[in-house]
Structures are given as structure tokens and as C-alpha cells.
Curated annotation (Swiss-Prot):
Annotated protein name in UniProt: Uncharacterized protein ZK512.8
InterPro entries: DUF5386 (IPR035332)
Highest taxon listed in the record's lineage: Eukaryota
Region (Disordered): 1-50, 71-91
């Protein structure tokens, strides 16, 4: 180590010691910190997880309390909203009727017809480009629907009294 580096190091150390004397030291006293209990209504945040927590109008009992009262068994799911042994939700089957097959939309997505106001009453079809189809329809409630389909891409624009809808998807 060179003598020059050693002297500059001493200078930096002494300068930092001088700067530290200008700032007050910060200390924490353990007697000043106070714990807030989570029960007896003293907690600022009510926990709805246990019977020991702050009582409110809605409360979820913990797993042990529910087991003791016989409301659940050991195989019950751990979610508080599904403890009564409900059957799992099943996917609803949508039946395709012959009314849906009158549309240029693919049969595998009949829900769009329900979404957009049902089956139209009067239709005119036009061939557009290579393999494309334009269908102009009058709706039962009043209004018009335009369906354009080409290369498995479908666009539907419908305008009725109080509703305008544009829907595009690829089959």
C-alpha cells in the first residue's frame, strides 16, 4: 500500500466522523411501543376469522369451531362460502335448435344469437368475395342486423331501439 492512499483514507475517515457529530442519534425505547390486541374490540382492524376476534354482524368461524359444532367434517373444503356440501357447479349445456342454424354464424356458438336479441325474422343473403357471405336481417323488435362471414371470421353488427352491438370473432 502506498503512503498516499493511506493518508487520504485517514482524511476520509476523519471527515465522516466530523459529519456524524452534527446529526443526533436515534434510539428506540421498548417501553414506548404498545401492542394492540386483536380481541375485546380494541383492535382497529376487525378480523372475521375466529370467534375470539371482534364480534360484528357477520363473522366466519374458524375451522376448529365448525368441526366441534358438527357443521363441517374433516373433508370439507377450506373456503367459508362452500361449507354446506354443495354440489360442484356444472357447465350448462346449450342445445342448438333449428332456429339457430338459419344464421351464417357457426353452429358451435349459438349463444351469440341469444346475446344479440334472438333470431331475425326476414333475411337477405349476398355472396361477397371468395367464399364470403353478407346477411342483412330485420329483427322482430325492430332494427337491423348485418352479418359478414369469410374464412372462419365472423362480424355481426346489430342496431335495435336502444341497443347497438358490434361483435367479431374467429371460429
Amino acid at each position: 500500500m502506498s503512503h498516499r492512499n493511506d493518508s487520504s483514507r485517514k482524511h476520509r475517515k476523519s471527515r465522516s466522523i466530523k459529519n456524524d457529530q452534527h446529526y443526533p442519534t436515534v434510539s428506540f425505547d421498548g417501553a414506548e411501543s404498545v401492542d394492540i390486541p386483536a380481541d375485546e374490540g380494541k383492535s382497529p382492524v376487525s378480523t372475521h376469522l375466529s370467534l375470539a376476534s371482534n364480534p360484528t354482524e357477520f363473522k366466519f368461524m374458524d375451522e376448529i369451531a365448525l368441526l366441534k359444532r358438527g357443521r363441517i367434517d374433516k373433508d370439507a373444503p377450506k373456503h367459508p362460502y362452500n361449507r354446506r356440501g354443495q354440489q360442484p357447479m356444472m357447465k350448462k349445456e346449450i342445445s342448438v335448435t333449428s332456429a339457430h342454424s338459419n344464421s351464417s354464424l357457426p353452429v358451435r356458438s349459438p349463444a351469440i344469437m341469444t346475446l344479440m336479441g334472438g333470431v331475425p325474422e326476414a333475411e337477405k343473403e349476398y355472396n361477397v368475395g371468395k367464399g364470403g357471405l353478407l346477411k342483412i336481417s330485420k329483427m322482430k323488435e325492430g332494427g337491423k342486423r348485418y352479418e359478414v362471414s369469410a374464412n372462419e371470421r365472423f362480424t355481426v353488427f346489430q342496431q335495435t331501439a336502444g341497443q347497438t352491438c358490434l361483435f367479431t370473432f374467429k371460429a
